[in-house]
Swiss-Prot record:
Name of the gene: ripply1
Signal peptide range in chain numbering: none
GO biological process per UniProt: embryonic pattern specification; negative regulation of DNA-templated transcription; negative regulation of transcription by RNA polymerase II; regulation of skeletal muscle tissue development; somite development; somite rostral/caudal axis specification; somite specification; somitogenesis
Keywords tagged on the record: Developmental protein, Nucleus, Repressor, Transcription, Transcription regulation
Residue numbers covered by motif WRPW motif: 28-31
Note: Named after the expression pattern, which decreases in a posterior to anterior direction in somites like a ripple.
Domain-level remarks: The ripply homology domain is required for transcriptional repression.
Main subcellular location of this protein, as a coarse class: nucleus
Residue span of region Ripply homology domain: 71-106
Family per similarity comment: Belongs to the ripply family.
Native source species: Danio rerio
Name of the featured protein: Protein ripply1
Role played: Plays a role in somitogenesis. Essential for transcriptional repression of the segmental patterning genes, thus terminating the segmentation program in the presomitic mesoderm, and also required for the maintenance of rostrocaudal polarity in somites.
Subunit structure: Interacts with gro2 via the WRPW motif.
Amino acid sequence: MNSVCFATPHTKHMDSKMQLTSSPASLWRPWLVTRKDAQTECRRTKLACPYSRPEVPGNTTTDGKMQSFQHPVRLYWPRSKSFDYLFSDGEALLRNFPVQATINFYDESDSEDEEESCDEDDESDVEDCLKHNSHFTAFN
């Protein structure tokens, strides 16, 4: 293994250059966006998509690309398929979805008859409530 070491005299000019390059402000950190980077990205975005919606803060990745989603990501899955989720469909869904997401189950109605029966139940509840209110006001 061969190695070479060069020695040069130390000058004041070199000292000032070292201070400039070793200062914390001059270190490039890809996760920090500088004002210059933000202005350049803003100009590029306005030129490429002049009629686009304004950017949501925190909706960009470190490389400046726009995300097509906003965290927290919720995927809605019908409760009737929750059994399928526990085995294969849900695993495949989360595997193919490129971000961390949670699956939220929701109740779905299979027919309009259920909706009509709910409406009838609501009307009967209102009538019962009115009967109780009239009952209480009669004694007062």
